[in-house]
Design a protein with these regions (language model features):
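Terminal targeting signals and extreme-terminal segments of soluble enzymes
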Residues: 1-149
Length: 149
């Protein structure tokens, strides 16, 4: 990833494609969450999140916010895998349906695109417990904008 000086601070040039999407899932928030990429293509993102004590609510289950954050980084990674050069993304809207409590030790998510457009992409992420039962399904819209804006 190349860097450039802009307004007195260093900024990293944004990569695109599946390789850049792997980087998305290995840095910042995903790393703090304990996300581990399994496979990334332009049509499917698969990752796992090792449940940590910080993810647990007072009932001993995975906090809904942790599941939403997991899904958010999955949709972002899928979008990055499909971005044209010189563009970036951000979450515009996210909707979560919870079906059951999240369980330890590892949750698995699969994201698939519902729409890949020029200005927006919509991703659906299904998060499953270790027993394969669906804990949540998240649908999110990602905006596609020039990297300089």
């Amino acid at each position: 990833m190349r860097t450039s000086k802009k307004r007195g601070r260093e900024s990293k040039a944004l990569g695109v494609g599946p390789a850049a999407a792997v980087h998305v899932l290995k840095s910042g928030m995903p790393r703090a969450l304990g996300v581990r990429p399994i496979s990334i293509t332009r049509k499917r993102v698969v990752a796992e999140m090792r449940v940590k004590p910080i993810h647990i609510n007072r009932s001993g289950r995975v906090n809904g916010g942790a599941l939403m954050a997991f899904a958010d980084v999955m949709g972002a990674a899928g979008t990055v895998a499909n971005l044209p050069a010189g563009y970036r993304t951000g979450t515009l809207e996210s909707k979560t349906n919870f079906f059951r409590a999240g369980e330890r030790p590892v949750m698995r998510a699969v994201s698939i695109p519902l729409h890949i457009g020029r200005t927006t992409m919509v991703w659906q992420t299904t998060i499953r417990n270790p027993d394969g039962q669906i804990a949540a399904i998240v649908t999110q819209t990602q905006i596609v904008i020039p990297a300089k804006s």
